[in-house]
């Protein structure tokens, strides 16, 4: 299965992706991990990304797209993947379509993890990170909503909504049921 996971920070995408990766036997491709790997391995793309990060600038979409393209071209992603953190914009959605066209494949679905703002704030405050104040979290949620709203419209025919509240197990059960329905 080739899936994109969408949802606000704190929706549990990473947690669900790890479980789904195990159950479906496909890699969890997180853009955060891709950045860390490329920078850590001192690849050409990693060096380019690091130069922007060190200067306090956003890494250009082209660099992220190339990292994703490289990763999705690897053998373990041939039968599927779970994309987490990409795409974030309609422009990146178009880029992903181009990557997949080049690989002769397409997305099976976009999983949108729906969770209330209050639950996200509660979860993120519980993590106990110093930079996770309620104000910072609510700002991140607003940025997510503003950035991602057009993407939800872009993928409207592919979206499967998952209620991402309750236990990790309950959310995973709902996700697996939705994917089984997609497969039948």
From Swiss-Prot:
One of its GO terms (biological process) is AMP salvage. One of its GO terms (cellular component) is cytoplasm. It catalyses: AMP + ATP = 2 ADP. It is found in: Cytoplasm. AMP binds at residues 31, 36, 57-59, 85-88, 92, 129, 140. Pathway: Purine metabolism; AMP biosynthesis via salvage pathway; AMP from ADP: step 1/1. The keyword Translocase does not apply. The keyword Acyltransferase does not apply. Pfam families: ADK. One of its GO terms (molecular function) is adenylate kinase activity. It comes from the Bacteria. Residues 30-59 are annotated as: NMP. Residues 126-132 are annotated as: LID. ATP binds at residues 10-15, 127, 166. Belongs to the adenylate kinase family. Monomer. This is Adenylate kinase. It comes from Corynebacterium kroppenstedtii (strain DSM 44385 / JCM 11950 / CIP 105744 / CCUG 35717). The lineage of its organism: Bacteria, Bacillati, Actinomycetota, Actinomycetes, Mycobacteriales. The gene is adk.
